[in-house]
């Protein structure tokens, strides 16, 4: 199955405005509110703010066995997303905002920590998370608008499963 779009379409992705109903992560609407607040604080205090994008890389995740059965693949991916959310909650600070932004992944908003600390967090995550999980860092440029920043994060987030 070279084209994963059929399987991706089957994956449950719904929220009630507050949380993702599959994983329990924050819903995008909540994430946006927190991001807007943290950007205002970051601009006022001249602190850094970043988003780490975490996504399942289906090219690495899918095995020959589950490529043959779409329903099993869907079920396996959903179970992996739930497991991944719990791993992320253990890896990041309680104050870091974890949101399920797509059918295959999460964004984590990191506020008030410098580039060195972020790189340490990413290093720890790469050692802890499975090989089929892709992570990318996108720091907000000073004065950058929210949507422009999200556009840059989107490019990183969705680049793995094309």
Predicted regions located by residue number:
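A short glycine-enriched loop-to-beta-strand structural element that forms part of the catalytic core
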Residues: 96-111, 129-158
């Amino acid at each position: 199955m070279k084209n994963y779009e059929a399987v991706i379409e089957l994956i449950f992705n719904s929220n009630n405005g507050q949380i993702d109903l599959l994983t329990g992560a924050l819903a995008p609407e909540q994430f946006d509110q927190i991001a807007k607040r943290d950007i205002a604080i970051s601009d006022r205090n001249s602190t850094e703010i970043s988003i780490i994008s975490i996504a399942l890389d289906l090219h690495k995740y899918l095995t020959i066995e589950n490529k043959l059965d779409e329903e099993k693949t869907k079920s396996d991916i959903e179970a992996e997303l739930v497991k991944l959310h719990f791993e992320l909650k253990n890896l990041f600070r309680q104050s870091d905002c974890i949101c399920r932004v797509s059918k295959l992944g999460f964004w984590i908003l990191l506020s008030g920590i410098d580039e060195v600390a972020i790189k340490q967090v990413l290093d720890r995550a790469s050692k802890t998370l499975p090989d089929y999980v892709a992570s990318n860092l996108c720091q907000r440029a000073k004065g950058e608008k929210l949507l422009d920043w999200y556009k840059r994060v989107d490019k990183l987030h969705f680049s793995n499963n094309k």
